[in-house]
Amino acid sequence: MRYIVNKLFIKIVILFCVAFIGSCFMLHAQDTFPYPAIPKEIKDADKRLSFLIEHYWDRFDFADTSLLKRNIAEQGLSDFLDILKGADSTTVNDGVKIFVNRFVCSDTASTEAQLVKEYFVGKMEQYLYDYRSPMRNDALYVSYLQTISNSPLTDTFEREHYRYIINNLQKNRLGETATDFAFTDRGGRVRRMSGFKGRDIVLFFYDPDCHSCHSEMEQMINGKSLLNSNIVVLAIYPGAETDRWERGDIFIGKNIQKSLNSKGEGIEFIDGCSIGGEILSKDIYFIRELPSVYIIDKDGRVVLKECTAKDVVSYFQRSPCPALDF
């Protein structure tokens, strides 16, 4: 805990120095992001962090579109999102509201204001929502979307779109019980995911024609960490086109053979197809991209969400895995 506080304090000091130096050399143009200066009287680390977040955007000129082209805005936003990781949820939500109100509640009639809004909306999606972003954070993105969707300056279409994403991102969150569903296996039997409770489940949503699905599955198998009798891989085609799923028998069959040892022992694979494509049509799981991989523990809780093959291998080797929420 002391290490985290000290590290955060050092970052705040660095940001203060950058702000001071930047202000000394800034003439008519803003050449660096204008980080706020934290008053010396504030000694408590948490209060310094709260002040930094609350006043982070005070000196940034949201009307100057040249800052967008020179990447000054992007650097400032990246640092802001990084700083939010060290704050409590209340401070985070307050900071996000201040930020959103600054770029949304400007002169909406001007072309410059619209450019600024589009820029920050795009960057927030890129950093926090994009499937492969190292900064992806569902909880923070939901906080942001809730704020922007509640703005009176957000139109009806945008508001409905944001609320759709909010609703889906709040499904099957880390630590929560994974939503059960029915599927048909290769033998024609109707089964349920809950039937495997008591075992670790690698839930692998795939498409037979998806090259990335092939690659990710092979990486998981080559890692050998799934060679455990208490682990089951549920490879599920979430769509409604059963003819495409039937072609996938070759894909799954090849990978099963690769996973077996000389005694015929290996990973247990269950290959299934969503009944009527309900996983997609009813958004039972929010699948942004395929493959979409979850790890569900013996108690049926989600422990990794939308992870990579590398994350799966690391998890079952009991090595640290990237955190996707906070």
Predicted regions and their residues:
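Bacterial Sec-dependent N-terminal signal peptides
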Residues: 1-32, 305
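N-terminal targeting or signal-anchor segments and their processing/structural boundaries
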Residues: 25, 29-56, 63, 67, ...
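Oxidative protein folding and maturation machinery
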Residues: 30-186
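Short active-site neighborhood of thiol/selenol oxidoreductases, capturing the structured segment around
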Residues: 192-220, 233-234
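Structural microenvironment flanking redox-active thiols in thiol-disulfide oxidoreductases
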Residues: 214-260, 276-281
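Short, internal strand/loop/helix patches
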Residues: 249-294, 298
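Thiol-/selenol-based redox modules, centered on thioredoxin-like
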Residues: 289-290, 295-326
